Amino acid sequence: MTLNLCVLTPNRIVWDSEVKEIILSTNSGQIGILPNHAPIATAVDIGILRIRLNDQWLTMALMGGFARIGNNEITVLVNDAEKGSDIDPQEAQQTLEMAEANLSKAEGKRQTIEANLALRRARTRVEAINMMS
């Protein structure tokens, strides 16, 4: 038995096919979803989506949003998403270093909050690459 996973951003469909299992980062922690999972709607945190296709695991960096699960269908609507295999490791590492530098230079609450979010997004992209290796 399989699940139909659809990952959408405001601009594109990132993923739309059948999967065996997923592990999703929510605001209350990670949840594993197998076929016949109880119906839920949940907020999606900035984090990694792990997708199992047969015996292979793939990763995707998600940038926050919402997910609806029911009737073996999972719809994930996020601000942005990138497959781990599509992320350039050097560019992701440079972005992480820039985000760390920007956080140390942040002045005031707003800049600190924005810098922290940028750092979380950058770390998630690097983590998506590292989970593939």
UniProtKB/Swiss-Prot annotation:
Domain of life: Eukaryota
Compartment(s) where it occurs, according to its Swiss-Prot or TrEMBL record: Plastid, Chloroplast thylakoid membrane
Keyword Ion transport part of the UniProt annotation: yes
Matching Pfam families: ATP-synt_DE (PF00401), ATP-synt_DE_N (PF02823)
Keyword terms of this UniProt record: ATP synthesis, CF(1), Chloroplast, Hydrogen ion transport, Ion transport, Membrane, Plastid, Thylakoid, Transport
Membrane topology term: Peripheral membrane protein
GO cellular component: chloroplast thylakoid membrane; proton-transporting ATP synthase complex
GO molecular function: ATP binding; proton-transporting ATP synthase activity, rotational mechanism
CDD domains: F1-ATPase_delta
Keyword Transmembrane annotated: no
Family matches, as NCBIfam families: ATP_synt_epsi (TIGR01216)
Subunit structure: F-type ATPases have 2 components, CF(1) - the catalytic core - and CF(0) - the membrane proton channel. CF(1) has five subunits: alpha(3), beta(3), gamma(1), delta(1), epsilon(1). CF(0) has three main subunits: a, b and c.
Family: Belongs to the ATPase epsilon chain family.
Function per UniProt: Produces ATP from ADP in the presence of a proton gradient across the membrane.
Protein name as annotated: ATP synthase epsilon chain, chloroplastic
Organism: Morus indica (Mulberry)
